[in-house]
Amino acid sequence: MATLIDADLLTAIVTPFDENNKIDFSSLEKLVNYLIGQGCNGFVVGGTTGETPTLTHDEKIDLYKHFSQFVNKRVPIIAGTGSNNTAETIAFTNEVAQIEGIDYALIVVPPYNKPNQRSMVAHFSAINDATKIPFLIYNIPGRTGVKMEKETIVQLSRLDNIKGIKQCASLEEMEYIIENKDPDFQVFTGEDTQALTARLLGANGVISVASHIYANQMRRMYDSLYEGNYPLAAKIQRWLTPRMQALFMYPSPAPVKAVLNAQGLNVGGCRLPLVELNDEEKITLAQRLGLDDNALMQKLPLDLGKELEDD
């Protein structure tokens, strides 16, 4: 299996849909190859950005099988398998574990039920004991309605099958987790704007939405950090931050899909209950991305960071 040891820039990839609202596997394969070529070294498939709540069980299995074939063991794959039903999560995670090339599962803190910390420990401990694939916790309180506290994360980091976390919370909480976790437990920020700072603090990297659009710049940012060119790494993050924020100004993944479509990567629209951006929203998004007003209604180049190339 491919491991996350050397993965620092992972894309939480969109699910392309065709004109009949079916998964567009041809466009997905094109996008996978493009992103790997731009410097992404891992993927989350079937996550929030992949609109997983709108996918049926069979669609998810089909998606994961195709995705594994497209990646062909070049980089690690993390597949979303979580739900707010523990037994269902265990069953689906074990089913996904049978798909060759799926390296890890991503299991979200249960939404809607509003479990307390003791309930979260029981939920993830049960999954740890009953599943056959290593997995990461997905802590995203803005979407689930509850937050796994840093002490709970550290406690769960000791369990054999829990290999890491996608953490969407404050940097102070991340510091605590990194300082106190099991040494083999890997920490990824799920907040694009934290990509550089989290890495400096000792996180393994970022699971990113913005890397669909800015993978080349994010790879350069990390490489600059590793080379000791801290001013350049910081400059790239400062350039990226307002653009990263803009990609969430409307319900995600509608903004990133609008940009990808303008770039010719043809990922289609969103499934209900989300809708694609209208023209007014595209203009506002383009402005926030530093583009011409009508840029998202025309053909857009793949490289949107040429102004950084002279540094």
From Swiss-Prot:
The active site is at Y138 (proton donor/acceptor), K166 (schiff-base intermediate with substrate). It is found in: Cytoplasm. PANTHER family: 4-HYDROXY-2-OXOGLUTARATE ALDOLASE, MITOCHONDRIAL, DIHYDRODIPICOLINATE SYNTHASE. Belongs to the DapA family. The lineage of its organism: Bacteria, Bacillati, Bacillota, Bacilli, Lactobacillales. One of its GO terms (molecular function) is 4-hydroxy-tetrahydrodipicolinate synthase activity. It comes from the Bacteria. Catalyzes the condensation of (S)-aspartate-beta-semialdehyde [(S)-ASA] and pyruvate to 4-hydroxy-tetrahydrodipicolinate (HTPA). It is an enzyme of class 4 (lyase). Gene3D superfamilies: Aldolase class I. Homotetramer; dimer of dimers. SUPFAM superfamilies: Aldolase. GO terms for biological process: diaminopimelate biosynthetic process; lysine biosynthetic process via diaminopimelate. The keyword Lyase applies. Pathway: Amino-acid biosynthesis; L-lysine biosynthesis via DAP pathway; (S)-tetrahydrodipicolinate from L-aspartate: step 3/4. This is 4-hydroxy-tetrahydrodipicolinate synthase.
